[in-house]
């Protein structure tokens, strides 16, 4: 009986793995070449204009894609009003919805109900990085949009700014991403800003931090909880609006803003990867683009699954 049960379990796992593989295989760089040939150029024009107007928007759009993919897969669930948007890691900090809505409206005007919000998010992430001087990559397409979202999963599946190295490795591993992917994707913190409430404990209580850097950050982040919680500081103090490898050099100098940044270089298993990325921009770019493609393949809805939303913030009626 035990043998039969184990065989059945093994078969189920194989089937599940095969289904996941098929879903990823259904994504294609040429998915819209016939159905909406101007989709990518239309999205790019919207994203590039938005990032040129406000550099921080590039980081916000990249973060939207990350927070989408880590919660029930890359399915645009993060764009549905409420639910995931109300989760602790997202509330009061997610931005860029209007830019995605604008891109969606522009695409709908040329190809009605053809291009998914999930694909727009994936393309927007790539175009944001490029607009800030970072590397490009081929975005695989064909995702469909979910009809549900989960605040509970957003609270459990998204990494916290207080995460340890082991917690980060485990969190990413559960999404099919290895430790190198995790360190590379953390390099997205070469752009963007963080709220005081997410780095207060680090700048006042941690010892593995450059003292001058801590003092600089304390000037705009008071010690008392509730005072200046939403005040912002750049995640990369060196080149905050350029997508480069300076983030890793900052870690070598103990100038990581978040606890979850500095744990990447603190005598642990990720130290050598951080050193490599700090000294070799090409190695970082290669690892980052590889990891972005892998992240974009997390549990996509394809074929007849889900829907193509008419409005990214709500399911079709």
Swiss-Prot record:
Binding-site list for substrate: 159
Principal place of residence: secreted
GO molecular function, one term: heme binding
Record's keyword terms, sorted: Calcium, Disulfide bond, Glycoprotein, Heme, Hydrogen peroxide, Iron, Metal-binding, Oxidoreductase, Peroxidase, Pyrrolidone carboxylic acid, Secreted, Signal
Signal sequence, start to end: 1-25
Entry binding sites for Ca(2+) 2: 190, 236, 239, 244
Annotated active site: 67 (proton acceptor)
Location of the protein in the cell: Secreted
UniProt GO cellular component terms: extracellular region
Cofactor note: Binds 1 heme b (iron(II)-protoporphyrin IX) group per subunit.
Residues bearing the modification Pyrrolidone carboxylic acid: 26
Class of this enzyme: oxidoreductase
Residues modified by glycosylation: 112, 171, 205
Role description: Removal of H(2)O(2), oxidation of toxic reductants, biosynthesis and degradation of lignin, suberization, auxin catabolism, response to environmental stresses such as wounding, pathogen attack and oxidative stress. These functions might be dependent on each isozyme/isoform in each plant tissue.
Protein name: Peroxidase 22.3
Gene name linked to the record: POX22.3
